[in-house]
Amino acid sequence: MYVTFNEALDSSFGNLESPNHDFKVGDPNMVPTPPMDSDSAAISLAFLISLSITFAILMLILVVIAAYVTFCGDDESEYDEENALGTRTSGTLHSLFGKKHSGILLDSSFASPGGFDDEIVLQERELEELPKMSAYEVELYIRAKEFQMMSPPMVKDFGTYLDSDDQQFIKDRGIQSYFLLPSINDNIDEYGNFLPSFIVQDKLDIQFSKFNKSSSTVMNYPLPHNRKDAVYFEVKIFRHIQKSNSIFSIGLTTVPYPYFRVPGMAKYSIAYESTGKLRINNPFTASTLLPKLEEGDTVGFGYRYKTGTIFITHNGKKLMDVTQNIGIDLFIGIGAFNAAYTRTYTRDGLLEDPDNVSFREALSEGKDIEVAKDLQRVHDPHDDSDEMTSDEVELHVNLGQVGFVFIEANVKKYAFGSVYGQIGIPPAYNGTEIKKDTILQKGEELPPRYADTDNFFGSMKVKEGSSSRITAQTSKPLWSVGTYERISSNFDRENNVYHDSLETDDNNTDNNVNNNDENAGCNENSPLLEDDGNKRPENSNTPREVSDGAINKNPRNKSTKKRQRNRGKSSKKKNRSRK
């Protein structure tokens, strides 16, 4: 039982004043017990009230910050999405290519929703940039806008594009299941022949032809989830001459993507251009942030699953992390176009490009500017007399079927999957497995005995039917090759007559017999005519008598000869009797 300090003090003084108690001095080391507050409920209530007030103030501060970021983010519009050295750091570049809470990918026309009207800004940008383009560039820009209005891009969460059948096929076949889609553009000549803009070889090797004006292709399947930290692919520049009039782009896109537009120039696409420009949904002027690509270079793109980051490599060295918070299915995209049909990449456009400092310095100093011959002026692709052939470009895509130039991708296994999938490699047909088979080896030691016949299929005979007059006899002599070719055609047998063939018509035979009767006297004096008219060569036969390389003697010919001979003898006897 605890008592208060005042009660203890009154009790001690009372003991001193009482005569019935002796005075006792207490222990000097003894410390009096401090008083305790018995009202603990009041203290707990005050503590809870103060804690609630603190949390309320914190929540109010967070709400104010969220409202400010949401409705007062106009400063994002001042940032150039292509220039990482602008007013903001390169780490915030992902806000231009990020996605909303609903999973929709934002394009480069706006940075934060609700900040301003993106359509008005886009119209202002078009009024500024379109006059700087050629007629062909404006045509492609309008076609791309109409294409994506009619066929909106499929912006889906990562891993939701494929169905169960496609996923099983990829597991079975591995990298062998991936391929680039073929050319589907509308280039034809005056005769209607298809002129492909590019040719896909061995599924992953693409070659842009001389007929290419502006085209692109995508992979048949999106980036896979290989159960690693990231997925990665590389593109080897196998052929690209210096001062080429062809410009190509390598990157990632959504589908469907305009087949006549290179990656990076339409919505929901990012690309590394061969000129060194980095394009993110930008068909207008872009800044040069990357090295220019030459023949023999290797460009790589990687995607990290956890952070949604896209990074770019060049010749095995990582250059930069381009975007973050990407959570949609993306496809590999490759495209190329003829720069001679554009104003952006011809002489006038190159001089206006702020990144071409050397051109402006040379122009100010009065020096000659080295520009390719095809890029001196803008050409018209719709004019046959002004049409230019494109320089060929050949690119090879590596999904992991061979080693990467980027060492980290090899060590951490960033490939698209196994080369041959769960089915494995196909069997070898070079004979090494056959040599190990005991039964097949025994069969080689004891070859089968084939029948000794006239030909490979043995002795073949054709049975003679009721309406057939042909009997195959392989033992008889064959016709010559030339004669056999002439009589082997139905048309020749019915319409053409050769000097070494005989007429088999009965009417012709009767006519010959009548002529012999009328000219019997003449035949006696001219035996040559008699032989020619009455006797046939022994080795000559009609086409009807030849079949399957065999020669048949028609019994009708024998009877005809006998009648001719008998009539000849009778005519001779009559002449003698008259004499």
Curated annotation (Swiss-Prot):
It comes from the Eukaryota. SUPFAM superfamilies: Concanavalin A-like lectins/glucanases (SSF49899). Residues 499-579 are annotated as: Disordered. Gene3D superfamilies: 2.60.120.920. GO terms for cellular component: endosome membrane; vacuolar membrane. The chain crosses the membrane at residues 45-65. It holds the Pfam family SPRY. There is a cross-link at residue 367 (Glycyl lysine isopeptide (Lys-Gly) (interchain with G-Cter in ubiquitin)). Residues 66-579 are lumenal. Residues 555-579 have a biased composition (Basic residues). It is a single-pass type II membrane protein. Residues 509-525 have a biased composition (Low complexity). InterPro entries: B30.2/SPRY, B30.2/SPRY_sf, ConA-like_dom_sf, SPRY_dom, Ubq-SigPath_Reg. It is found in: Vacuole membrane; Endosome membrane. Keywords: Endosome, Glycoprotein, Isopeptide bond, Membrane, Phosphoprotein, Protein transport, Signal-anchor, Transmembrane, Transmembrane helix, Transport, Ubl conjugation, Vacuole. Glycans are attached at residues 212, 356, 430, 507, 557, 575. Belongs to the SSH4 family. This is Protein SSH4. It comes from Saccharomyces cerevisiae (strain YJM789).
